[in-house]
Amino acid sequence: MISIVGAGPTGSLLAILLQRRGFEIALYETRADPRDARAESGRSINLALADRGIHALKVAGVFDDIAPALLPMRGRLIHYQNRDTAFQPYGQRPNEVIYSVSRHRLNQALIEVAAKLPGIHLHFQHRFESADFSSETAQIRDLQHDRIITVPMQPLLATDGAGSLMRRELNAHQLIQASETDLEHGYKELSIPAGPAGRFPMANDALHIWPRGNFMLIALPNADGSFTATLFLPKRGPISFESLNNAKTIDQFLSHHFPDARELMPHLLEEFRAHPVGFLGTVSAIPWHAGAQAMLIGDAAHAMVPFHGQGMNCCFEDCIEFDACVEQRLPWEKAFAEFGASRKPNTDAIAAMALENYLEMRESVADPNFQLQQALSLELERRFPQRFIPRYSMVMFHHEIPYLTAQQRGATQADILSDLTRGATALSDIDFGRAELEINAKLLPV
């Protein structure tokens, strides 16, 4: 029997895939069953679902179970401090959208599918405690009955997220080398309630961004007409979560920097005090496995900052790539090693691109030269679709292009865009004959 620790979206999807390969699965989760109405916290966490995640859900045969919970976002709606707005489309094809989805609803839907499959045994309120690698067993605490149960690691797959206890256990036993790099910024979740009759108070087909240089606010739509907003801010310094330490400074800060958003936040002060500052950082580990006994997968192996909307998508892609290794019926240790060797260069690439995207979201999106390069990028894709696809589009809308390839081609394309826009202020200034020569010389067909 395969043991999976962590029944969030990644662990649930992995269990479904492996069950369909004929394996029996024991799925352990610290939290209560998400199908229980009491299990949902008062906070609403939104995730971005893009092409890679959708492809994985379709491979697993569960996309139709998730689709009703999805809200499409066609692009970014930039909110300037003077209350002006500007829409920046993500792509130029009807299918090039990103979906906002409630983490709780997504997890609930996946658990409902898993619960119906014979051979998947769900154990909620069961927390991983420790591993004994000499006896190839793990100790898991049954929180309802306050007792320890021992389960075999034959193998144990850890999908227990960025704070993975299994990763720390493997690291403590020097079976892997793991690190956590903390970003100087943190985040705080806030809310924008629905308007009268449940109407959306802002456009519901966009990701709303208030870029302000060293900090920003974003908001994603919810199915009930509300928005989940997230404030990203340095943890310490003159403008920071540390400095926003009383009702007056909080209100003044939001009213000054995000006036149109502040007017839509009647519960700002209560939420600001009640909600903790969240951790932002990058997790790295090498290797991801210990022999044939245990393997990390998803955020447990490679958590990233959330600024490319790829955390969950990357984890879901992990699941189908590991499933492809399992399909070969290799011994577990060999399957783990092959999966890690092929996957890690791609997860390293998206982790780096996610960090770069933070700078883009909070600073560059409001910059005229950046906006020109974005417009040119889409125009070059229209003219030369076999060779030029914007990096953002490669990551978000092309699951067939590995992250590493997107990163490498993206670097070349960035040089081309910089070269072509030097001295230009509009698309009419661009020499497209020269653009074609550069693209043909520097980019192979995709």
Model-derived features: positions:
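Glycine-rich FAD cofactor-binding loop and adjacent beta-loop-alpha segment at the N-terminus
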Residues: 2-3, 7-75, 79, 94, ...
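C-terminal helical "tail/cap" subdomain of flavin- and related membrane-associated enzymes
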Residues: 324-446
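Helix-loop-beta segment of a Rossmann-like dinucleotide-binding subdomain
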Residues: 84-101, 232-236
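Hydrophobic "anchor" residues on beta-strands that sit immediately upstream
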Residues: 2, 25, 121, 150, ...
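Conserved mid-domain beta->alpha element of the FAD-binding
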Residues: 7-20, 190, 276-366, 402
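Acidic/histidine metal-binding catalytic segments
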Residues: 68-72, 121, 256-273, 331-338, ...
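N-terminal Rossmann-like dinucleotide/flavin-binding domain of flavoprotein oxidoreductases
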Residues: 55-59, 106-121
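Conserved FAD-binding catalytic core of PHBH/FMO-like flavoproteins
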Residues: 112, 117, 126-130, 135-290
